[in-house]
Design a protein with these regions (language model features):
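Helix-loop boundary and gating motifs at the non-cytosolic
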Residues: 8-70, 225-267
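Hydrophobic core of transmembrane alpha-helices in multi-pass small-molecule transporters
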Residues: 30, 98, 109-125, 315-329
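Conserved MFS/SLC helix-loop-helix module at the cytosolic interface between two early adjacent transmembrane helices
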Residues: 70-106
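Helix-to-loop junctions at the C-terminal end of transmembrane segments
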Residues: 71-83, 168, 276-289, 373-374
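Structural signature of the two symmetry-related core transmembrane helices
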Residues: 86-100, 291-306, 383-386
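Cytoplasmic helix-loop-helix junction between adjacent transmembrane helices
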Residues: 114-153
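Glycine-rich segments within core transmembrane alpha-helices of 12-TM secondary carriers
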Residues: 147-168, 357-365
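C-terminal membrane-cytosol helix-exit motif in multi-pass small-molecule transporters
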Residues: 190-210, 395-400
Length: 407
């Protein structure tokens, strides 16, 4: 009995060796995560409730994805050459004006251009975030750092998703309209993201990072690794885009669930996803990165497929929550793994390339998924997504089972 007790460790103890500056970087970024969580519900559920079609919402998402794809590589190269810290902070400054526009209008003439700005900020984040955490940690501590990032990020995303659950109570107590509460919340969150950017600047203003005169993937091992990793990941991106960003719309169309309920559902999913990070580092340590990724993603795919057969809302929600937790348990492991198999000076560019080849097919398939839902075809997106997931998982194991992170 005593030996069992000595082996047990508090869950949070796995993060004790993560550098304090990395922890505060993660904590300060949670203000932006909170805002983006609400923003996602606003786009994918509230806009549909006020009469904007799933097809138009898909276009907004596609425009966001297009700007992300077009600028990710230039921004990634700039991050490697000019500093990942500066790119991350500058990217965060683009979020407040985007939120302010959404708080002021529902006119697509303005919302669609804001999709462009959203893509730019996302590209800046992708090119800098993983690379910056990897730069500030060692191989030993890195999985725990990425797990903490995933944990805090998803819980704060989830809190943003859950905000609409309080809106009926606020409306009843104040007499404010639904539109006023939704837009007012967006305005307040815009102010919070401004504060978040200021805190990040204060934290990192004296951080010294290594700049690289060149940022490109030479022909050879690095190029082959990034190409294989990214192409396989793009298959999952295409499958995910068919339905995952559109889950609130699917719940609305098939079961009549409004954003006051779909928001908390997404919140619960993100909390579970965040808590799954406790298992991520442990699985990677016990089984290795590749096996841990394959097992969690394959298990998730079973529940993805099962969603097509859900005949009532409670069952659909339960299946979705399990799928989300299992699929995203692999995310911090994949982030840490990619940063470990790529040289330090190419991390920003590698992150950008991987993000592009995931996001481009994801953006295209979101439009396809929105059109299918608009046409009343609610099952096919899940069948297609599950098939693409399974293909990618098998390919990933076949290609990377013998490739280990660099010391």
């Amino acid at each position: 009995m005593s030996s069992e007790k000595t082996q047990r460790k508090p869950l949070l103890k796995m993060f004790k060796d993560v550098p304090p500056k990395v922890k505060w970087l993660i904590y300060f970024s949670s203000l932006t995560n909170l805002a983006i969580g609400y923003f996602i519900v606003y786009i994918s559920a509230y806009l549909a409730e006020v009469g904007i079609s799933a097809r138009d919402i898909g276009v907004i998402m596609a425009v966001n994805g297009a700007s992300f794809v077009a600028l990710s590589i230039p921004i990634g190269m700039m991050a490697d050459k000019r500093g990942r810290r500066n790119i991350m902070i500058l990217g965060s400054l683009g979020i407040p004006p985007m939120l302010l526009v959404y708080s002021w209008t529902l006119d697509l003439t303005y919302l669609i251009p804001m999709g462009l700005l959203g893509g730019i900020t996302e590209a800046a984040f992708l090119a800098s975030w993983n690379a910056l955490i990897a730069d500030m940690t060692t191989v030993k501590v890195r999985p725990a750092a990425f797990s903490l990032s995933f944990l805090v990020g998803n819980i704060t995303f989830g809190t943003g998703f859950a905000l609409p659950a309080a809106f009926p109570m606020i409306q009843g107590a104040t007499g404010w309209s639904s539109a006023y509460v939704h837009s007012g919340t967006m305005f307040v969150l815009a102010l919070l993201t401004m504060a978040g950017s200021a805190l990040l600047w204060m934290l990192l203003k004296n951080y010294k990072e290594t700049l690289h005169e060149t940022s490109r993937l030479e022909r050879g091992e690095s190029l082959r690794i990034v190409a294989k990793f990214s192409i396989i990941n793009s298959t999952i991106g295409f499958g995910a885009g068919l339905i995952i960003p559109l889950i609130p719309i699917w719940l609305l169309y098939k079961f009549g669930i409004l954003d006051t309920y779909s928001g908390p559902i997404l919140a619960a999913a993100n909390v579970l996803m965040g808590l799954s990070a406790f298992g991520s580092a442990a699985l990677a340590k016990k089984y290795g990165d590749v096996k841990a990724i394959v097992v969690t993603q394959a298990s998730s795919t079973i529940f993805m497929f099962s969603l097509a057969f859900a005949m009532n809302a409670p069952l659909a929600v339960a299946l979705y929550l399990i799928r989300a937790a299992l699929m995203n348990m692999a995310s911090p492991i994949m982030d840490s793994y990619l940063m470990g198999i790529i040289s330090e000076r190419q991390r920003g560019l590698a992150s950008a390339i991987n993000g592009i080849v995931w996001r481009l097919p994801n953006s295209v398939s979101t439009v396809i998924g929105g059109a299918l839902l608009t046409a009343g075809i609610y099952d096919l997106p899940f069948f297609l997504a599950a098939g693409l997931y399974l293909t990618a998982i098998l390919l990933f194991y076949a290609v990377f089972k013998d490739i280990k992170p660099k010391k």
